Design a protein with these regions (language model features):
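An N-terminal, well-structured beta->alpha segment
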Residues: 2-106, 195-235, 243
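Conserved phosphate/anionic-ligand binding catalytic regions in large, soluble enzymes, centered on
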Residues: 39-59, 146-149, 239-251, 307, ...
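N-terminal small/polar loop signature for handling phosphorylated ligands or for N-terminal nucleophile
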Residues: 90-153, 256-313
């Protein structure tokens, strides 16, 4: 561990800090715990880049850390040769406080290293950055965003030439390089305006939007159904103060939605997210303004995208007419089932269709895919793995991926992005809702019909939060305990197979035989139970918490719900 007191003093004495930054550090003088939490070591650069609260300090998100991280990334790009520097980087940012300043700081460092920069003139959805990297043939991409985290956070996500987030080997190369770089003296910089004049920085804007949106709109399968219900079909949309505010409504209107109602208060771009505690479409509480508007105008369907517009959540009216949240698992199943039918009806289904999901996403999606002649493949959590799998399958000529999704409200569609894309997903989910509306059904009705057809699947994710400096130790201890002393039964139901994605082992609990899985190299444990339930445990990659996923199935809705309750009670015992 770094001598945090010495590092704190070094920052205080540095000429690199301005008066406000020094005042912020002087204000915590004497607060040992706060000083330690800011200076105990540098932020760890992972495959998701960096994410943290915005404060002055080595272990925080600020302009100095952004420059330092960018210098490491620039060195890795430069190591690929002059052509890579010429291809350059695309840079994008979300609506958060400091996002624009951080993005410009990253551009200045890239330019000073002779790397060509294409930077968006203002905030854009994350999928548009992935598109820009691919469209302009860039070597890499940088996105300043903390996605759906609270307002105190910001982040730095990095992409490679395929438009996907960085593969582990490149992330490791950057992390290794950063160990050699002094945060103040080791970073090259060139003033933004000078770099523009020198032709090293160019601005991206409307032209890129048009190219991106032409790809998005080409994904439409069925305008006829939308036109059929256009006069009565009503949609409420909220961007939660973020990047979806322009392109999502444009996509829906382009689809033929006549009655689109946007939540005015949340169409205001604001990185403090004044109307919500959390700008996360996974949290139904944030939809209160959208529900009020939907009730006022008589809409049955609500869409909400997170601040960087890579994830989308929906709400629909339930059996009693009140709005209920449809989970990411359920939305994905609905969309997959719909797309298979819609693509076949439109003559757009490829010869060997594939569908990708993560290991923690509902098994109902596999059932839907395989029942309809679509091959299903699992990947680790994160769209970089799904992008990698899509690239590999298609390059080998094995088939074509029609959809990829994960349970946390992310969907990757089409061939023009390699990350989750709430713009395209919003378009196709709305097309689906209109198609069902033409049949006199809501998406709630549609979901019940799918349960009757494919089985009563149910899922629940628990977050075991472990904050503080000892949080990581507690997380490691829990994972170690589950490995060294694994449960023989869970909530009274026998564990039949125990899988460890770290080493790829699969243990048959009855015989003790050990088999090998296709996937390995990730800190995830999987317990498959005698009643068909699967429980997965993994540490979060971005926050101090252990995530526990319950994937179950019942003979009917009541049995499914009882299973979720039973296994949820067991999960709570893990931290006792």
């Amino acid at each position: 561990m770094l001598d945090y007191k010495r590092e704190y003093e070094r920052w205080l004495a540095s000429d690199a800090l301005n008066a406000d930054e020094k005042a912020e550090l002087q204000a915590i003088a004497g607060d040992e715990k706060e000083i330690e939490s800011r200076f105990y070591g540098p932020m760890e650069f992972g495959t998701a880049g960096l994410r943290g609260t915005m404060k002055v300090g080595l272990h925080q998100m600020n302009v100095h850390v952004i420059r330092w991280a960018t210098q490491g990334f620039a060195d890795v790009i430069a190591a690929e040769g002059d052509e890579a520097k010429q291809k350059g980087v695309a840079i994008c940012m979300d609506c958060r406080v400091n996002s624009m300043a951080f993005a410009r700081a990253a551009a200045e460092v890239c330019a000073a290293n002779g790397i060509r920069v294409r930077i968006f003139e203002s905030l854009r959805p994350t999928p548009e950055l992935s598109f820009a990297v691919r469209y302009y043939g860039c070597q890499a991409g940088i996105n300043v965003t903390a996605s759906h985290n609270p307002k105190e956070y910001n982040g730095y996500k990095v992409y490679w030439a395929d438009g996907a987030q960085l593969p582990p080997q490149h992330a490791a190369a950057i992390a290794a390089r950063l160990e050699q770089i002094d945060i103040f003296t080791g970073v090259k910089r060139m003033a933004f305006d000078d770099a523009v004049k020198a032709g090293l920085i160019t601005l991206l804007g409307e032209e890129t939007d048009k190219m991106f949106m032409s790809n998005v709109m080409a994904m439409v399968n069925d305008r006829t159904s939308v036109a059929q219900v256009a006069d009565s079909f009503k949609v409420v949309y909220t961007p939660f103060h973020g990047c979806g505010w322009k392109l999502v409504p444009e996509a829906l209107r382009g689809l033929g939605v006549k009655n689109l109602y946007c939540v005015e208060q949340q169409m205001v771009l604001d990185g403090t997210f004044p109307t919500v505690a959390s700008p996360n479409p996974e949290n139904p509480e944030g939809f209160y303004l959208a529900i009020d508007l939907a009730d006022k105008v008589g809409a049955d369907f609500i869409l909400g995208t997170d601040p960087d517009s890579d994830r989308v959540g929906i709400m629909v009216r339930g059996a009693d007419g009140k709005f209920i949240a449809v989970t990411g698992n359920q939305t994905g199943v609905l969309l997959l089932d719909y797309l298979i039918g819609a693509m076949r009806r439109a003559g757009k289904m490829p010869e060997h269709p594939y569908f990708l999901k993560t290991i923690v996403t509902t098994e109902m999606a596999r059932k839907v895919a395989e029942s309809n002649g679509v091959t299903c493949c699992d990947t680790f959590t994160g769209f970089k793995f799904m992008a990698e799998k899509k690239n590999a399958l298609e390059a080998a000529g094995e088939g074509h991926v029609i959809m990829s999704y994960e349970e946390s409200y992310g969907y990757m569609l089409g061939d023009y992005v390699r990350d989750k894309d709430a713009v395209t997903a919003s378009l196709l989910i709305t097309e689906m809702a209109a198609w069902y509306a033409a049949k006199g059904m809501t998406l709630y009705d549609a979901l019940q019909a799918l349960y009757k057809k494919y089985g009563w699947y149910g899922e629940k994710t628990h977050n075991l939060v472990m904050p503080g400096l000892d949080g990581l130790e507690k997380m490691a201890a829990l994972m170690k305990r589950l490995r060294t002393a694994p449960p023989a039964n869970i909530a009274g139901v026998d564990v039949v197979v125990r899988k460890d994605y770290q080493d790829g082992s699969a243990v048959d609990c009855a015989t003790g035989n050990v088999g090998k899985m296709e996937l390995s190299g990730s800190n995830v444990l999987r317990f498959e139970l005698a009643d068909g339930t699967t429980i997965l445990v993994r540490p979060s990659g971005t926050e101090p918490k252990i995530k526990v996923y319950i994937l179950t199935k019942g003979a009917d809705a009541a049995e499914r719900d009882a299973n979720i309750e039973k296994y949820s009670a067991w999960v709570k015992t893990l931290t006792e």
